[in-house]
């Protein structure tokens, strides 16, 4: 039995939380993600950039009522990577099942 390697991008608690949220809502504002993850703006910003650089999310910056707004959206690659991560975790919980 060989354990599948876990995706290092998703293995961070905050990045996994962001992707998990985006899986369910598809896209969300930075403030929503910050509130739901209880993270600081600085830490969340760094982790969002790592997810963006990996191609797991798209980030759009715009203005709404003269206020800056950052929208994060899950990509197909992000969805596939999340599903692979979950499958890898399941293989750890059921090592005799393939």
Regions found by a protein language model. Give the residues of each.
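Amphipathic alpha-helical dimerization/coiled-coil segments
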Residues: 2-3, 20, 79-98
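N-terminal helix-turn-helix DNA-binding core of bacterial DNA-binding proteins
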Residues: 2-40, 62-65, 69-73
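Residues in the helix-turn-helix
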Residues: 43
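Glycine-centered, phosphate/nucleic-acid-interacting loop/turn motifs that mediate DNA/RNA or nucleotide
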Residues: 55
